[in-house]
């Protein structure tokens, strides 16, 4: 019996452990909607959209910009800006410690990235929220980076696109955070006065001060499929009005049906459809027409 344990069972267990440890972490991903187990490299090919149920998973700001803009001619705006704990705010934890933890987790200095570049040959400037950074909350640096992107659009007369994913204003910055709602709204008013298109893309989720300001001020407002969009969460609203709310009333499909947004576009169609839309809004040739002209020339 002892020989069998030594010669057969123990080596078998050791081989099994070696196999387990050799599987890279994060190679498989479980869809939060249909619970299908998906192979990570294949999921990346579908832009983090479940091939089984079409669930649009949350992705980071840099990943979103990377799949949206052309590869060449990119330049980040306001990358040097860093948040400062001006109020020495503390709840259960110091704000500066929360910032340090979020920066370590995401590799970003704050919750918004702005970048100039091209969309299928059309010059544009893009901002994208990083939800993993303190819930994509809007503080002074988020507001300033957004304004710098808008100013770039004004100076270069190019369209601006913003991908929102946020829980709202950053409570640790108090009034400074709330001021960003006015600041971003004011610069968008300038874009509108100058006739420069601003497209707002609402991704999952968009709430609070962001939904009450810049996210809903687009000339065209686009939602990703089944994105949660609102001001307060469903539970808070139900407790306030003391009524049961309709199923999915904060989903992008419900908002489209009731006229709160203009379009729902799947992630894999965003590049071509927004490029065509912006070409029409700016009077420039569509990417398809530009290719035809180049081919004839």
Curated annotation (Swiss-Prot):
GO terms for cellular component: acetate CoA-transferase complex. One of its GO terms (molecular function) is acetyl-CoA carboxylase activity. It is found in: Cytoplasm. Its EC number is 2.1.3.15. Pathway: Lipid metabolism; malonyl-CoA biosynthesis; malonyl-CoA from acetyl-CoA: step 1/1. One of its GO terms (biological process) is malonyl-CoA biosynthetic process. Keywords: ATP-binding, Cytoplasm, Fatty acid biosynthesis, Fatty acid metabolism, Lipid biosynthesis, Lipid metabolism, Metal-binding, Nucleotide-binding, Transferase, Zinc, Zinc-finger. Gene3D superfamilies: 2-enoyl-CoA Hydratase, Chain A, domain 1 (3.90.226.10). Pfam families: Carboxyl_trans, Zn_ribbon_ACC. Binds 1 zinc ion per subunit. Its main location: cytoplasm. A zinc finger (C4-type) spans 31-53. Signal peptide: none annotated. SUPFAM superfamilies: ClpP/crotonase. It catalyses: N(6)-carboxybiotinyl-L-lysyl-[protein] + acetyl-CoA = N(6)-biotinyl-L-lysyl-[protein] + malonyl-CoA. Residues 27-296 form the CoA carboxyltransferase N-terminal domain. PROSITE patterns: COA_CT_NTER (PS50980). Zn(2+) binds at residues 31, 34, 50, 53. Its cofactor is Zn(2+). Acetyl-CoA carboxylase is a heterohexamer composed of biotin carboxyl carrier protein (AccB), biotin carboxylase (AccC) and two subunits each of ACCase subunit alpha (AccA) and ACCase subunit beta (AccD). PANTHER family: ACETYL-COENZYME A CARBOXYLASE CARBOXYL TRANSFERASE SUBUNIT BETA, CHLOROPLASTIC. Belongs to the AccD/PCCB family. Component of the acetyl coenzyme A carboxylase (ACC) complex. Biotin carboxylase (BC) catalyzes the carboxylation of biotin on its carrier protein (BCCP) and then the CO(2) group is transferred by the transcarboxylase to acetyl-CoA to form malonyl-CoA. This is Acetyl-coenzyme A carboxylase carboxyl transferase subunit beta. It comes from Pseudomonas entomophila (strain L48).
């Amino acid at each position: 019996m002892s020989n069998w344990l030594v010669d057969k069972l123990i080596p078998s267990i050791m081989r099994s452990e070696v196999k387990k440890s050799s599987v890279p972490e994060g190679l498989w991903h479980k869809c939060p909607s249909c619970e299908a187990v998906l192979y990570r490299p294949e999921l990346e090919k579908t832009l983090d959209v479940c091939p089984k149920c079409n669930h649009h998973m949350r992705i980071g700001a840099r990943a979103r910009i990377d799949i949206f803009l052309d590869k060449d001619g990119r330049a980040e705006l306001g990358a040097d800006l860093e948040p400062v704990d001006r109020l020495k705010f503390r709840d259960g934890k110091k704000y500066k410690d929360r910032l340090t933890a979020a920066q370590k987790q995401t590799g970003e200095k704050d919750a918004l990235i702005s970048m100039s570049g091209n969309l299928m040959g059309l010059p544009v400037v893009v901002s994208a929220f990083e939800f993993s950074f303190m819930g994509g909350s809007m503080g002074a640096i988020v507001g300033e980076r957004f304004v710098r992107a808008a100013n770039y659009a004004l100076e270069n007369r190019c369209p601006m696109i913003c991908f929102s994913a946020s829980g709202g204003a950053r409570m640790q910055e108090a009034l400074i955070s709330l001021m960003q709602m006015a600041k971003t709204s004011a610069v968008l008013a300038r874009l509108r006065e100058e006739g420069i298109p601003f497209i707002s893309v609402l991704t999952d989720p968009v709430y609070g001060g962001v939904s009450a300001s810049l996210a809903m001020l687009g000339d065209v407002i686009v939602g990703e499929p089944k994105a949660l969009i609102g001001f307060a969460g469903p539970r808070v609203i139900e407790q306030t009005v003391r009524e049961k709310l309709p199923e999915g009333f904060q989903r992008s499909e419900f908002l489209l049906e009731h006229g709160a947004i203009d379009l729902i576009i799947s992630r894999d169609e965003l590049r071509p459809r927004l490029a065509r839309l912006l070409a029409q809004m700016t009077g420039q040739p569509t990417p398809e027409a530009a290719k035809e002209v180049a081919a004839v020339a």
